[in-house]
Design a protein with these regions (language model features):
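Intrinsically disordered, low-structural-confidence terminal and linker regions
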Residues: 1-11
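Non-catalytic, usually N-terminal nucleic-acid engagement modules in DNA/RNA processing proteins
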Residues: 10-82, 101
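Eukaryote-skewed repeat-based solenoidal scaffolds used as protein-protein interaction platforms
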Residues: 49-52, 71-156
Length: 156
């Protein structure tokens, strides 16, 4: 049986190579996804698992699927750079931000999403930014001095 060995996030310090050269935002130092030089709308959205069947490359690749379907991207983002460059747009990973998850889990999933998107952006992919949030800890300042969900996303 030739199974790919799955690596844990902590095996190498949460993939420090993903944020080499990145800018960071806020107290939590969330990696920044830079604003695009122009605002355009994708022709459509193609789920990651269906990207091989995409008719054109003017679609945005998205990750609005269960996390295990794109786990390989989380494990080895570099393996997908060339594949993702074929498309005009790439949305950040949609790592689940369960509202009943501890705040630390919500923050690490947001961090991973921004770190990988920032990495792809620095490697030639056009990132179509999006803000995501979990429970009220992530989108208000009632519990934390910054709105965590919006860190790392350039706001107009």
């Amino acid at each position: 049986m030739n199974k790919k060995k799955r690596k844990a996030n902590l095996d190498d310090g949460c993939n420090p190579e993903l944020v080499r050269g990145a800018k960071f935002d806020g107290l939590l130092e969330i990696p920044v996804i830079s604003a695009s030089s122009s605002i355009t709308i994708p022709d459509g959205f193609t789920p990651f698992t269906r990207r091989e069947k995409a008719l054109g490359t003017d679609d945005a690749i998205c990750f609005f699927e269960k996390d295990p379907k794109f786990a390989d991207v989380l494990i080895d983002p570099a393996a997908y750079i060339e594949d993702f460059r074929r498309f005009r747009y790439l949305l950040p990973m949609d790592c689940s931000l369960y509202i009943d998850a501890p705040l630390a889990v919500q923050i690490i999933n947001l961090y991973r999403s921004r770190a990988i998107a920032s990495y792809y952006q620095r490697n030639g992919c056009n990132i179509y930014p999006m803000a995501r949030w979990g429970n009220e800890y992530t989108y208000t300042t009632a519990y934390f001095p910054e709105r965590i969900a919006f860190l790392g996303v350039t706001q107009a």
